[in-house]
Amino acid sequence: RTPARGDADADLADTAIVRGLGLDLVFPVLHGPYGEDGTVQGLFELANLPYVGAGVLASAVGMDKAVMKVVFAARGLRVAPWMLVMRREWIADPADVVARVIDTLGLPVFVKPSNLGSSVGISKAKDVNGLREAIALAAEYDRKIVVEAAVPHAREIEVAVLGNDDVEASVAGEIIPSREFYDYEAKYIDAGSKLLIPAPLAPAAMDEVRQHAIDAFRAVDGAGLARVDFLLDGQSGEVFVNEVN
């Protein structure tokens, strides 16, 4: 990605600091806050350094699960039923928050900090006590908490996307987690999870998730490369876009 240059920053690339780096291109192999939320991408833009991957906008949207779901829905992509809880609401009246979640989504639900990666702070709540604990945990990490209805018998599907304006999608893969869901421990600690490539999907379902991956990538104004995650209802076959990474 080549940063857009205007008159105001025309000389930034000629500064001693940038010249001293001796870089032709930056490939940011970074994760989480500051690394993939648009912060370092903004730094590259200011320094007029070409870099690989999503720009400031796509990175910021891709980090904020709540904003991302709104964008997906606006583009006509199906997302699992969800609601946003603010930490101040939880602190002020936990009982009201719990009641609203159950009334709106029922149980079970997944509770997630809106702006973290690697499934940090994510819990599956199956009862009222579990819901309280899950919201309290997520509130330790973020002021914005996403609560999402659990997709029945969910299959975790992922598709790689490559390109800028002309975008290509890989075949879909399927994650078989070693735990109840693909949480932090399943991703990084135990080695029991499996990845099936290609995912065992019917041709029509494979085509659907690949097209939805391209649509989701374009919805957030993606660039370079990304992984788009889906949840597939094991009973109905419905496909829900989960997030772009």
Language model regions located:
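Conserved metal-phosphate-binding beta-hairpin within the catalytic cores
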Residues: 149, 159-161, 217-245
